[in-house]
UniProtKB/Swiss-Prot annotation:
Keyword Coiled coil among record annotations: yes
Keyword Signal: yes
UniProt protein name: Outer spore wall assembly protein SHE10
Organism name: Eremothecium gossypii (strain ATCC 10895 / CBS 109.51 / FGSC 9923 / NRRL Y-1056)
Ranges of Low complexity composition bias in the record: 560-572
Top-rank lineage group of the source organism: Eukaryota
Localization per Swiss-Prot or TrEMBL: Mitochondrion
Function: Involved in spore wall assembly. May be a component of the mitochondrial RNase MRP (MtMRP), a ribonucleoprotein endoribonuclease involved in the cleaving RNA transcripts to generate primers for DNA replication in mitochondria.
Region described as Disordered: 539-572
Gene Ontology terms: biological process: sporulation resulting in formation of a cellular spore
Keyword terms, alphabetized: Coiled coil, Mitochondrion, Ribonucleoprotein, Signal, Sporulation
Amino acid sequence: MRAISKLFVFTVLVLGSLQYYCGRYGACPAQIAVISHYTWPCTYAPAVRDKLGKASEWYGANAAPHVSVASGWMQGKVMPHLTKVSQWTEKHVQPRMRQAGADAIVTARVAWNVVQQYQRRHVVPLTGRLLAKCPCLERWAEQAARGWQWLCKHARALATAVQQQYPAFVAHMGGIWEPLHGAYNRIYLDLGRPVQEKTSEDASAAPGGTQYITSTITMTMTSLDELVTVTAEDGLSDVVEASFKDLVADEFSAWQQAIERKADSVLQAFTEEVGEFEMQQHEAVAPKFRALLKHISAKSQEHYAKINQAIRDINSTMELDPATNQTIWFDAHGTQLHQYITRPLMREYFSQANDELANITNHIRAELREVVDSVNGQVDVIRQEHIEVYEEWADVMVSEWSRRMAYIDVVDRDLEAEAERNRNWKRFLKLKKRVIKVRDQLLEHPVKFNQLETFLKEIQSTLRILAQENGEYLYILRSKANLSFQEREKNDRLREQHEQEAREMTLREQLSTELAANGTEVIIDTFEVDLDQLLRSNSTSWSVPPADARAEPASGSPIQQAASEAAQQPSV
């Protein structure tokens, strides 16, 4: 593979050199002219143009519809996510990049000032001493300067030659570039995007109509002895002192800018981290509370269905099981009931519904309180972390800069600069107070959970609405159950009255028959006055099996027991 790569590179270089030679000088042997002709890209321009035209037609008939569908899918499915990513990048990444760029610029300035200071303090005096001890270095510097000038001269000549040959190369490449560019434009237009076309006249413009502006940078090196004179110690010290003052001013300005940027960004960083935490909490708790609301709704419907079925089973029919001689009950559709619906049983159903719904509601509210406490606790942790980081940063910055200013006071012995040093210390104290103030602001900075707070309020509002609706509907069902019980008790009393009248009629007929058989018809009128009392005294001997299997047989008829029970118990 390596040999093939070398062969390919060698072939390309040979062909390129051949094309350059034939285009530059024109006269070349016939065999070389043939090779140059068939290796020149413009030779194949007509064929390429014809093939690209056919390919464009095939593309418009076969590929363009699918490309349009893919483009629509791209716009509908992918672009919204790309927009979100772009917004997130613009909000979070770009500010950090700008901040990093600004910090890098400040760091570079400080480093450059330090390098300049080191160069003026150490390199320049050392160079002067070396030049004084070794005169040959001066001659070497002169030779290096002349070599550099020669190199710059030939580099400028080479650049000029390349610029002169470049228009001819562009003109030769225009023949092959034009069909490729036209086919690309047609494909690009099929995608529904704007295209800026380039005409052949523009592509094959005459070299003479193009103007080039060449800027040449010339560096003139003088010998180092002209820059540094060993005997000029006073002038050098003045330059060093001036540079030192500039360096101090630049460092103080950079430190002040760093303090101000940190003070402005610390609250923003805290707010952004809290916002990200809020988003994570909302995504974590939202499915949980939605599931709890669905659960309480499902439980409410279960209790409603159970109570409604019990209300429908209140009006039931009583029969006696011939096999077990026990009372059984049937609903309106003839289905046997598992148990007889009484007022205590109905009250138990209502109590179960109220208790379970209240427990679920209390559980949801406890979860809400737990979420609020957890969020507040985590916010305190985040705040404390930011405060600790800021305090550490502020302590390092303030202590290091105070040492730096103290060092400047020791090194700088200029009495005229005393006023400037006092102003710097005042500015330092002002910035230190600013740092402390920002720390207090970070400690008391309010936190707003707009999205999470809105969601929790919606959950609480939904709970209140569900509790109100459950209470109202259970009250309606309780009233409906009372009406059903009253209707059943009324029917039981009417049925008991009819049965009592039937028994009285039967007893009268029996007594009349017995007296008539004995020839004592006159006595009937005599006993008519005490007949009702006699029937009441003998009514117990005509009782039917009890309505409730749990009731005592000798306590009267089931209808009488139900009526007495209803009279003694409160409503549902």
